[in-house]
Amino acid sequence: MIRVGIVGYGTIGKRIADAVVAQDDMKIAGVLKVSPDYEAKVAVSRGFPVYTLPDRVEKFKKAGIEPAGTIEDLIKASDVVVDASPEDVGRENKEKYYQRYDKPVIFQGGEEADVAEVSFNALANYEEARGKRYVRVVSCNTTGITRVLTSLTLNGVGIKKARIFIARRGADPKEHKKGPINDVVPNPATVPSHHGPDVQTILRNVDIVTMAVAVPVTIMHMHMAYIELDSAYPKDQVIEAFAKTPRIFLADVGAGFQSLAQVIEYARDLGRPRGDFPEVAVFRDSVTTHGNELYLMYGVHQESIVVPENIDAIRSIFGTLPKWRSIEKTDKSLKLTTEGKRYG
């Protein structure tokens, strides 16, 4: 059993913790919280050992939470650390704590790529994390783009270039201090946005340019993609590539999927925890080919899309399972869509 320590028990960290619990080859060593808030109390109620920073121990005790130890105690108790801290805090933790211990660490996409030896996406470069000490699971948007492009190339559909336009959610549902509320904000106003270069940390030879705006929604991101293929492919072949690829979901307007809100409602109706939707939701009706040009729209659930990637990254680091066996094991354990998917 791989002992997993999770630093940061917020939007991503708590979901990774639940995903680890669902595995039969991993277990939670503990989670780190810096504030004794309701999330810390939820972690305690889940039976997770809760650790904190040295200067926060007394604050936790006063709040009625007895810490299991400090961050360094958590590192020592873990075989691997998943750092799900806010943006840039992961790098600070690396410099202050992780470098002193011979333990692998998985960072999230909020960190710059050079925090790790390799950027990771299970479909695209699972094997590259093998034996690495520092691995970075790329961001939600980068994960979505990488999955879509890789699903094509894995199924014999070649890509010459990709131009992706992103309508980013303004904030996560719980983020009451973020926006916009009544605006559309270039994010950034310069071209390209950081997503394209981030994709290239995994798909190194892809010609890609991305642009992004932030919009006043909280549920998901929407991507609008123009992809130039290496030749003309039938639309049915492209759709079949998406249909066979794990972690891609084809949403049909005729089945009631007319918006991203309905994708999330579907997740809730399935009984998925928190209404999560880790798959990329490709709108089948949007998939259009014109000669060697491909157009499509797809949704990315920012709160959960990277969760299965973190589980696979753990197995890749330790070499416990080959690529497709790990992806299938993760998908089944998290009850993702597996019907009709090809694992290998």
Curated annotation (Swiss-Prot):
Reactions it catalyzes: D-glyceraldehyde 3-phosphate + phosphate + NADP(+) = (2R)-3-phospho-glyceroyl phosphate + NADPH + H(+); D-glyceraldehyde 3-phosphate + phosphate + NAD(+) = (2R)-3-phospho-glyceroyl phosphate + NADH + H(+)
Keyword terms, alphabetized: Cytoplasm, Glycolysis, NAD, NADP, Oxidoreductase
UniProt binding sites for NAD(+): T11, I12, G110, R169, Q302
The EC number(s) this enzyme carries: 1.2.1.59
Molecular function in Gene Ontology: 4-hydroxy-tetrahydrodipicolinate reductase; glyceraldehyde-3-phosphate dehydrogenase (NAD+) (phosphorylating) activity; glyceraldehyde-3-phosphate dehydrogenase (NADP+) (phosphorylating) activity; NAD binding; NADP binding
Predominant localisation class: cytoplasm
Subcellular location(s) of the protein: Cytoplasm
Cellular component, GO annotation: cytoplasm
NCBIfam families (alphabetical): GAPDH-II_archae, PRK04207.1
Family: Belongs to the glyceraldehyde-3-phosphate dehydrogenase family.
Protein name from the UniProt record: Glyceraldehyde-3-phosphate dehydrogenase
Organism: Pyrobaculum neutrophilum (strain DSM 2338 / JCM 9278 / NBRC 100436 / V24Sta) (Thermoproteus neutrophilus)
